[in-house]
């Protein structure tokens, strides 16, 4: 009743402090990636403990690669990430490669008979979603009565659109 615009009144206050962070790896790698971008800028060292099985590990690999490219040192030992504090991001020109998550829509459209030219994708990319090309090739190569099993644990973003091809 106090909020005629139907917006949630939410205020988050406080300061992110370095230290130990325990993150459930089965929920989303985005929480880990977010911490990895922020923690190097803090005063002290930090550790991220990934509990359970890490889903979407390919996305975490992309984050670690991006951090390295911009001069941030993160060490990974097992399920623990070590992040030194007081680091600075390096400024340099970068090429942003094509996004396999978005390209998956066009890859599936082509599989279903469209003729879309897809350019700008790095075939050597670390993106887990590039597996869409392998998944679609397996569908093409399969016999009509063959049962196929696809593991989308490391590429959950493409599974809904991939389902259209099945």
Where do the language-model regions lie?
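Structural preference for solvent-exposed beta-strand-turn elements
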Residues: 1-166
């Amino acid at each position: 009743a106090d909020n005629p615009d139907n917006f949630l009144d939410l205020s988050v206050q406080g300061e992110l402090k370095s230290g130990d962070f325990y993150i459930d790896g089965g929920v989303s790698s985005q929480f880990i990636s977010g911490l990895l971008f922020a923690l190097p800028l803090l005063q002290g060292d930090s550790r991220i403990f990934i509990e359970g099985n890490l889903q979407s590990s390919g996305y975490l690999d992309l984050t670690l690669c991006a951090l390295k490219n911009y001069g941030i040192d993160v060490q990974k030992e097992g399920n623990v990430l070590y992040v030194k504090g007081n680091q600075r991001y390096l400024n340099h020109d970068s090429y942003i490669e094509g996004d396999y998550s978005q390209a998956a829509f066009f890859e599936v459209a082509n599989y279903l008979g469209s003729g879309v030219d897809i350019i700008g994708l790095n075939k050597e990319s670390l993106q887990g979603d590039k597996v869409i090309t392998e998944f679609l090739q397996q569908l093409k190569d399969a016999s009509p009565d063959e049962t196929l099993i696809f593991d989308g644990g490391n590429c959950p973003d493409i599974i809904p659109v991939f389902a259209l091809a099945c």
